[in-house]
Amino acid sequence: MAQHTVYFPDAFLTQMREAMPSTLSFDDFLAACQRPLRRSIRVNTLKISVADFLQLTAPYGWTLTPIPWCEEGFWIERDNEDALPLGSTAEHLSGLFYIQEASSMLPVAALFADGNAPQRVMDVAAAPGSKTTQISARMNNEGAILANEFSASRVKVLHANISRCGISNVALTHFDGRVFGAAVPEMFDAILLDAPCSGEGVVRKDPDALKNWSPESNQEIAATQRELIDSAFHALRPGGTLVYSTCTLNQEENEAVCLWLKETYPDAVEFLPLGDLFPGANKALTEEGFLHVFPQIYDCEGFFVARLRKTQAIPALPAPKYKVGNFPFSPVKDREAGQIRQAATGVGLNWDENLRLWQRDKELWLFPVGIEALIGKVRFSRLGIKLAETHNKGYRWQHEAVIALASPDNMNAFELTPQEAEEWYRGRDVYPQAAPVADDVLVTFQHQPIGLAKRIGSRLKNSYPRELVRDGKLFTGNA
């Protein structure tokens, strides 16, 4: 694999020499950092099983190497990466997999280790959505996830990825993560804090990642991380699990943050060792039971993961002084909900008791039941999935609902050819050789729902959202 030149400040190299255990070679560390990062993907098991995905993609000649800590994760090698970007493949467009760095799959593996099955989870720093979507798949779209993102510009990306993967059990918020301890104390069974960090572990992906690095900035970042983990710990219920992770390598932002929490709440913090998380995990194990992953150990990004249990309640923080404002939705009454469900079933949309119907003016939404306890405590950017808009002639079903709820075995499903599917993703109407009979057509490709179309004569009117329309070369190889 080709080398690339990474910029290393001298003070960083000194710090790494001190931080690296004697069992590891510093020369191996430098050599690993100069190698470009291996690409990796995670199969979205909400859409397809790993076995079916491997069968579907077998003709492509992809080399898929299993990632030891994630059953759905694979390192991927492709001969035609330049000819067709991974993100333009049909399987990516329909949400069958997520392009995710291998080591970033570790925190969610830790969160669900030892049979942990949380029902209400918070992802404190969620964008772009790799870990939120991984959590949802582990929960099988049940329970509820609060996915928070402080950066306004990244909330839109977070929602796009959640929608593409067919996820229905997520509520999005846009806050500084330090508010949650006071706003929603002891509300979560599990919390993932993948903390903002100095990014020392990402040099294989970004050779200039350390251009603005300094020991002083590490100290400032660590101070913020302590405030974030303190807030998250308050939001965790007694008995709950907190996973703290970063993509950096210094101890100040990693071990020291977790040790600070234990010193602050000595009777309430228990470190849960991760040495048995996967075969070979002990190679990265610290004396506290954390995983400090230097890039040469597993040939991946540098990463840090700690798992903690809250063994008892801690003193509450002062209640927040802000007002959340009125919640603009109201529950749909049972009789009307039955009518809506019947109409939705007619176009192939079905949901279970984990989701409940709510209404705002002419909009119909499905919210995860597990999030209702948070209504009035935080303001949501987006909640659940938008099912439909009502109009005089019935319902205008929404694309995100089709992707999350549609059954490809429904009688109104219509399978497109590769050329027709590509036209669909380009936002164009489709003219199939044999037009379907139904007026409302569930459009599928590779037996996966990709949208809902109106049949007008021999034409299928495209309803693919404009913001998702793709240009350039797609999976048939035509530009």
Curated annotation (Swiss-Prot):
Its EC number is 2.1.1.178. It is found in: Cytoplasm. The active site is at C247 (nucleophile). It catalyses: cytidine(1407) in 16S rRNA + S-adenosyl-L-methionine = 5-methylcytidine(1407) in 16S rRNA + S-adenosyl-L-homocysteine + H(+). Pfam families: Methyltr_RsmB-F (PF01189), Methyltr_RsmF_N (PF17125), Methyltranf_PUA (PF13636), YebU_pre-PUA_dom (PF21150). InterPro entries: Methyltr_RsmF_N (IPR031341), MeTrfase_RsmB-F_NOP2_cat (IPR049560), MeTrfase_RsmB-F_NOP2_dom (IPR001678), Nol1_Nop2_Fmu_2 (IPR027391), Nop2p (IPR011023), RCMT (IPR023267), rRNA_ssu_MeTfrase_F (IPR023545), RsmB/NOL1/NOP2-like_CS (IPR018314). S-adenosyl-L-methionine binds at A125, A126, A127, P128, G129, S130, K131, E149, D176, D194. Disulfide bonds: none annotated. It is an enzyme of class 2 (transferase). PROSITE patterns: NOL1_NOP2_SUN (PS01153), SAM_MT_RSMB_NOP (PS51686). SUPFAM superfamilies: S-adenosyl-L-methionine-dependent methyltransferases. One of its GO terms (biological process) is rRNA base methylation. One of its GO terms (molecular function) is rRNA (cytosine-C5-)-methyltransferase activity. NCBIfam families: nop2p, PRK11933.1. PANTHER family: 28S RRNA (CYTOSINE(4447)-C(5))-METHYLTRANSFERASE-RELATED (PTHR22807:SF30), NOP2 YEAST -RELATED NOL1/NOP2/FMU SUN DOMAIN-CONTAINING (PTHR22807). This is Ribosomal RNA small subunit methyltransferase F. It comes from Escherichia coli (strain K12).
